[in-house]
A protein has these predicted regions:
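A short, solvent-exposed loop/turn motif at the edges and junctions
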Residues: 57, 85-96
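Bacterial Sec-dependent N-terminal signal peptides
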Residues: 1-40
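Hydrophobic beta-strand segments
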Residues: 53-57, 84, 121
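Short, ordered, surface-exposed loop/turn motifs in non-cytosolic proteins
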Residues: 37, 44-59
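Short Pro-Gly-centered beta-turn/loop motif in secreted/extracellular proteins
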Residues: 50-51, 74-81, 357, 368
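Short, acidic Ser/Thr/Gly-rich low-complexity loop/linker segments typical of extracellular
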Residues: 61-71
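Surface-exposed, low-complexity/disordered segments
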Residues: 105-370
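A short, amphipathic beta-strand motif
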Residues: 37-43, 70-72, 107, 118-119
């Protein structure tokens, strides 16, 4: 009897040790996947630390504000194709392209030289109110979410119409701050370039070409509001990241997407269009041979391999234009090379007013009071 009890006790202890080992391995795996990005921000000229600088993962709600010693710390649970941006009023924004593999301990930022380029304006043709309205239509969009947006520092925006090139040009010496009341976010956008070139000589008429370069982060100002959470979910499910995440996980059909050629009713099966495999921190997507055009057409002068219609419901018809036969998608639904694909139609029309953080639904947002 004593021997039997010892055997049972020994088995129990062995099972407990195995359980604790597996539990510890789970914690180790989680900690290995997570990364903590740290560093110190310095003024390049005087070599002093810079407090109050925003340091963020581009396009996300993951950020920190440097302390009195210029230090920052950002936790990211997965490696993604996103840069790290340092922004401070009075300084040029600085970008670290691959912070997950090559983040320096010290990042230097330089004071901004304030100057506007040559401005060619046809005097009296358009009021500032008209220019701002045209800018908002192309910058924020015209949806319910976009119409709820308020530019909180609109007076600091420099805007003019170049009458020689029929181009609306917008600049700002500081981040443009946008309150999106519909989605419960405050957006901070460093706008390096935003130009809207119209096909005719009238502001806001025709389908324009838009050139812009920017970086952005989101402050979650209403993280527990159920109505706003439902709005976010609805907006996200019509977005490009949602489509790309579904594609990367072989869940396009499950997510309600149909693929077709020029929106005809002969809907292509997902597996007949793409082959998806694992590739380190990305999903590798190969465009199947049957979809590759032998006589490559062009989109704004750029040759492309294929073009597919994307349908999710009656109000969400889009097109995806494939400039390559192979592309890579990270866990946030970002492309390793953004120029590999282009979207037109519904998804192509979405602007900053309908944008959510790239880490939406994956990483917890940070927020601070304003």
């Amino acid at each position: 009897m004593l021997v039997e009890r010892k055997v049972k006790h020994s088995k129990t202890m062995k099972i407990m040790r195995i359980f604790l080992l597996l539990l510890s391995l789970c914690f180790i795996t989680g900690s290995l996947n997570a990364q903590i990005l740290t560093g110190i921000i310095y003024d390049r000229e005087n070599q002093e630390s810079v407090p109050g600088a925003y340091v963020y993962i581009e396009g996300s709600s993951l950020f920190d504000i440097t302390n009195e010693e210029g230090k920052f710390e950002i936790k990211v649970n997965t490696t993604v194709n996103a840069s790290l941006v340092v922004s401070h009023i009075g300084y040029n924004s600085t970008t670290v392209l691959d912070p997950f593999t090559s983040l320096p301990d010290t990042i230097f930022i330089e004071e901004k030289a304030f100057s506007l380029g040559e401005i060619v304006v046809q005097a009296g043709r358009y009021s500032r109110k008209q220019l701002i309205k045209a800018f908002c239509n192309e910058f924020l969009g015209t949806s319910s979410a976009a119409n709820s947006c308020v530019i909180e520092n609109e007076d600091n925006i420099h805007i003019w119409f170049n009458s020689r090139t029929n181009t609306l040009i917008t600049e700002c010496d500081e981040p443009i701050i946008i309150l999106n009341r519909y989605l419960g976010f405050r957006l901070y956008i460093n706008l390096e370039k935003f130009e809207v070139e119209y096909p005719g000589r009238q502001l806001g008429v025709g389908l324009p070409l838009i050139y812009f370069k920017s970086s952005i982060f989101f402050n979650d100002i209403d993280p527990i509001n159920r109505r706003i959470a439902e709005r976010r979910k609805s907006v996200f499910e019509g977005s490009r990241p949602f489509f790309l995440r579904a594609l990367a996980n072989n869940q396009l059909e499950k997510s309600g997407y149909w693929l077709s050629d020029n929106f005809n009713k002969n809907v292509s099966k997902i597996h007949e269009c793409f082959t998806v495999t694992d590739s380190l921190d990305f999903k590798k997507v190969i465009v199947n041979q049957e979809l590759r055009s032998q006589n490559r057409a062009t989109f704004y002068g750029i040759p492309y391999w294929s073009k597919l219609g994307i349908t999710r419901d009656d109000n969400e018809n889009s097109e995806i234009i494939l400039f390559t036969d192979t592309f890579y998608i990270d866990s946030w639904g970002q492309l390793s090379q953004p120029d590999d694909l282009a979207f037109t139609g519904y998804m192509g029309s979405l602007r900053f007013g309908d944008q959510l953080p790239l880490n939406y639904g994956i990483e917890s947002s940070r927020s601070f009071s304003q």
